[in-house]
Regions:
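Carbohydrate transferase catalytic cores enriched for Leloir-type hexosyltransferases
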Residues: 1-374
């Protein structure tokens, strides 16, 4: 009997880890239908968004809880104590208070450990405590890149033999080249986006280095002079450190050319990505970095920070700059405007690179880690 914590996957308005959990669960359903094991999805609310469609050997356990916190440590722990299971998979970096000996945890990155000043102090404390617990008690850890696996091993003394690598995937049914120009134009009108533009996707927070991007874009525009048509579009909800981003935008001499879209539903994102001159991903730290791969799948060139796992994930299919060097980024933006052949080359290379990353292949790597003890 294998249990999966599904509260993240069951959230509306999903971002990173929530989409990761949702996609892996959906792929595991297909891979394990009738496999002889019983699979249980634990959640605090009725399963929705496709999660509720369960194969015969899959079950839902709903544990109601009135508070926005404490579900993992109280009702979920109590359920695991009352009804024993063989294996538990936690898709996010946390453990319940009570859990089976064979518990597997996915750790996406440890940016909070390497760059704590980019996180809320309380979040750093919570994550550090959780990671120490995981290091001591988890049977296996799943990492989303070789880089992240090494980081986890070195920082918390976890034997590398306990760490399994399963690269993230992307939804190729959603993120793909869009040939329907009218549909693209309709989305651009809806979000009031004018071409040409550079695009950044992700939570608008300190660790994503958006303030530096705004500063670089401002310098880029000033140098190109009056009448330059390029815009900067920021897509994603606000996060920790947004005040600095807001201040940088307010102080920019080209703030009228900077558009904040906030959260954009998955169904609309590919249309905006496809229309972008390039995606810029300036993050200080990433365990994997899904938005650049989604952009590549849409045929959009990528300019990325060379930090952490990003060169491992994208190889030679992107242009790279140091996240501390806005001048390097400005140079890359200029190159993609002045060298159309380079843009075509990156688009072609990106399309091929994106094919490597599927949720099915990720689930196929995770499945044997979960079933070896079942």
């Amino acid at each position: 009997m294998i249990g999966i914590e599904a509260t993240r996957a069951n959230k509306p308005g999903k971002t990173g880890v929530e989409w990761y959990a949702w996609h892996i669960i959906q792929e595991l359903k297909t891979l394990t239908a009738g496999d002889g094991n019983s699979w249980i999805l634990y959640s605090n609310k009725p399963l929705t968004g496709g999660l509720e469609k369960l194969p015969e050997n899959w079950y839902e356990v709903r544990l109601k809880w009135p508070l926005p916190y404490g579900w993992t440590q109280i009702p979920f722990s109590y359920e695991l104590h009352r009804h024993k299971i063989d294996v538990l998979w936690m898709p996010g970096s946390t453990l319940p208070r009570i859990f089976p000996a064979k518990t597997v945890v996915t750790v996406h990155d440890i940016g909070f450990h390497r760059l704590p000043h980019l996180y809320k102090k309380r979040q750093v404390h919570i994550h550090e405590r959780a990671m120490k617990e995981i290091a001591k008690k988890a049977a296996r850890v799943i990492s989303v890149s070789e880089f992240s696996g090494r980081e986890i091993s070195e920082a918390y003394g976890i034997n590398s033999n306990k760490i399994a690598i399963a690269y993230n995937g992307i939804d190729h049914g959603t993120y793909k080249q869009i040939k329907d120009g009218d549909a693209v134009e309709e989305r651009l009108r809806r979000y009031r986006v004018n071409q040409p533009f550079f695009l950044a996707i992700g939570r608008q927070e300190a660790k994503k280095n958006i303030a530096m991007l705004v500063k670089a874009f401002t310098q880029f525009k000033v140098r190109r002079g009056v009448g330059d048509p390029f815009k900067l579009v920021l897509m994603g909800p606000q996060g920790f450190g947004y005040e600095d981003i807001k201040r940088e935008i307010a102080n920019s001499s080209v703030k009228s050319d900077i558009l904040e879209l906030g959260y954009v539903p998955e169904v609309d994102k590919p249309y905006i990505i496809s229309a972008a001159h390039a995606l810029i991903h300036p993050a200080f730290y990433e365990g994997f970095g899904i938005p650049p791969i989604e952009a590549m799948a849409c045929g959009t060139p990528v300019i990325s920070s060379n930090a952490a796992s990003l060169p491992e994930i994208m190889g030679d299919a992107a242009l790279y700059f140091s996240p501390e060097e806005p001048e390097q980024l400005i140079g890359m933006m200029d190159r993609l405007i002045q060298e159309p052949n380079l843009r075509t080359t990156l688009s072609t290379a990106g399309l091929e690179m994106a094919k490597r990353y599927t949720w099915k292949s990720a689930a196929e790597k995770i499945l044997p880690v979960l079933t070896r003890w079942a």
